[in-house]
Amino acid sequence: KPGHGGHKGQLERRLHMVRSLWTAATGMIAQQTNVDTIANNLANVNTTGYKTQVNEFKSLLDQNIQTKTTSANGDTKPSSAQVGLGVRNASISSVFKEGSLTASDSDTAFAIDGKGFFAVRGADGNTYYTRNGNLKFTLASNGGNMLATSEGLPVLDTQGRPIVLSNNYVMSKITVSKDGSLCYPDAQNNPQPIGITIGVFQFNNPNGLERLADSLYQQTAASGQAINEATNNNVERSSIIQGYLESSNVQVVDEMVNMIVAQRAYELNSKAITASDEMLQQANNLRR
């Protein structure tokens, strides 16, 4: 049929341009998520114990536009022709590199030197984990003084119980050794353990933890069960440093560079959409 091949070729070209529109759109969506992640890192640059998040990408399926075949003289071509269909966000992972330690005037400021996490009891009764050691003593519901987070969540000891001290202790005199033992001065003003130790827990895969609000993490199947440093001799134990807080590990300069790269990638993908749209309009005009 006359002209049939020409119409078919025009249709294929238009389909290819529509494909480029969607491919560039996936790039814009991925870079928008990347910018969102970077903005969140910068917003938490002063959040105690915050861990930088990194956006990871994965390419979408490639489409075969020509399979392996032979040339005019019968020789086999070495490869096929494939075109990519875009990109997607594969994961947003946390970088659990330790942040720098900042001195604090608070007696209940604690930093963890190592891979461990503090354990806290949530309002729903579940156990959550955090690197934020900005703690305080509050009045317990059944009397005494309870070690808690700034949100009022009880901090747990090595037995998984809330840390509650009787009113016989002067809270300002409580000290904590590097192994997490709570100590109180004797008559000679020498600190003596009182039989309570702050719990510190590790995970085989901390990147598998689910991030929650208030710098909390929740255990998942991907993270594995919490490992109690006090009862497991196969892990390198962390140290608790009183009078210090762990700063966010966000590197502002790195995030600004990442922001510029993401912005440029977003801009180039938008230009690809504009170019594809103009080419599609020109192809449509050929039919007139």
What name fits each language-model region?
Residues H4-R288:
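Amphipathic alpha-helical polymerization modules
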Residues K1:
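Active-site anion-handling motifs in enzyme catalytic cores
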